[in-house]
Curated annotation (Swiss-Prot):
GO terms for biological process: translation. Residues 1-21 are annotated as: Disordered. This is Large ribosomal subunit protein bL27. Transmembrane segments: none annotated. GO terms for cellular component: cytosolic large ribosomal subunit. Residues 1-10 have a biased composition (Gly residues). InterPro entries: Ribosomal_bL27, Ribosomal_bL27_CS. NCBIfam families: L27. Keywords: Ribonucleoprotein, Ribosomal protein. The gene is rpmA. It comes from the Bacteria. The keyword Ribonucleoprotein applies.
């Protein structure tokens, strides 16, 4: 005979893998062309000058320079620019 009761089953124990979203390079920091600035879902932050946007809304630098965040336009949207290195 079994000396212990059989272990019950559970319906828990699953979770999705984290997507590592967020700001990767902050304002004032240097960045190389092609470097990722922000990984995001949707356009929480918009691409500004010298910044490109990937199909998953990732913002990346088009030129070497420094990152600069700014709010502008209708509704004070947040933009990120890359100021080219002198």
């Amino acid at each position: 005979m079994a000396q212990k009761k059989g272990g019950g089953s559970t319906r828990n124990g699953r979770d999705s893998e984290s997507k590592r979203l967020g700001v990767k390079v902050y304002g004032g920091q240097a960045i190389n062309a092609g470097g990722i600035i922000i990984r995001q879902r949707g356009t929480r932050t918009h691409a500004g000058v010298n910044v490109g946007m990937g199909k998953d809304h990732t913002l990346f630098a088009l030129v070497d320079g420094h990152v600069k965040f700014a709010t502008r336009g209708e509704g004070k949207k947040q933009f990120v620019d890359v100021v080219p290195a002198a």
